[in-house]
Amino acid sequence: MEKSYSFKGSEAIISPALVYYRDLLRSNLEKAIETAHGAAHLWPHVKSHKISHIIRMSMEYGIRRFKCATIAEAEMVASCGAEHIVLAYPLVGPNIKRFIKLSEAFPDTHFYAIGDCLDMLSRLGEAAQSSSLGNVDVLVDVNMGMDRTGVPLSELVSFCDSCASIDGITLKGLHCYDGHRTEHDYHDRKAQSDHVDRELKPLLKSICKNHPTCSLVIIGGSPSFPCHADFILTDGEETKNAEVYYSPGTVFVYDYGYSKKFPDLPYIPAAAILTRVISNPGRGIFSLDLGYKGVAADPEGIRGQLLGVEHCEEMFQSEEHWTFRMQPGYEDTCPKVGEEFFVIPTHICPTSALYPSVTVVENGEIVDEWEVTARNRKITY
């Protein structure tokens, strides 16, 4: 596996370095489009990479809608010319005015906010009415069982009714993220997803009947969106205009954590970290220049898959170092100072945010360097 991540010219790259593989990114994009039955059905999240080049690559494949976690990400996507952007994070404090200013700055892009709090949505509506916008489109954030954000299913219909009376906002649909759908077995994951979908569909029918503009449904994450791929609303007059979109994020770059946890997903990690041995502090021991300032420190457990070294085990990791010990009997095969290796991050999303730019490789050669555009919390607005 490690041979596919090696490339010419790596000796000149400062380590640790995050490397993206353009051919693998394209392959993952194509697989996601196939699963969604076409690019027009995808509304992908950009938080895993935060890179404008990948937005433009996605648009080359026909993807026109994107989901963001920060206003900086939304600005990056809008700057690429995306047609529809949902800021999938509750707006509180100064972020309400920031969202309004961003929407004003990009009039050709259709922005959506999400919300699960009537007071917050009222504040958003007031801000919209005081601006040149006059109105903001809103998706109700639905608690699909994760209990992180969102309106519980039992309160969804009444909440939407209340939203409809708020001046300055227009109810446009539902944001249905189920990040807790992490069952290892696809059939278990599918069964759990289907169970919630069966609860959601009649609620959506009622909401669409009462509020015809509420026609968008953005559903699923990377592990679950294949389970929702048959979430088709053709069983009634009320939902005939409903549009369903699937919202993976990690699948485009992918990582070791997902590849280990979800063997049914067909994606290949398209990012790796170039690292080097910096010390042999004892027989059979080696330290890499890859601490938790260079690879995400979550989740608990192994923080990445070290390629090209067998029969070794992790000792500990600190800010700038990652130390391993060879297993008994393999001490003589211990990597030497200066040797290069590649690590597939367990969690690519926070790892990407640790680097100002990524080296881009295709067909074993360096072809570009991409800025991690939305790494910071603020760009302009």
Which positions does each model-derived feature cover?
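Generic N-terminal amphipathic, Lys/Arg-enriched alpha-helix
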Residues: 2-20
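N-terminal glycine-rich anion-binding loops that anchor highly charged ligand groups
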Residues: 2-5, 24-54
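Conserved, mostly hydrophobic/aromatic
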Residues: 25, 47, 77, 140, ...
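Active-site-proximal beta-alpha core segment in soluble small-molecule metabolic enzymes
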Residues: 45-186
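Active-site loop/helix belt of alpha/beta enzymes
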Residues: 127-134, 143-258, 262
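Active-site loop ensemble at the mouth of alpha/beta enzyme cores that anchors a bound cofactor
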Residues: 225-308
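C-terminal accessory subdomain/extension
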Residues: 281-381
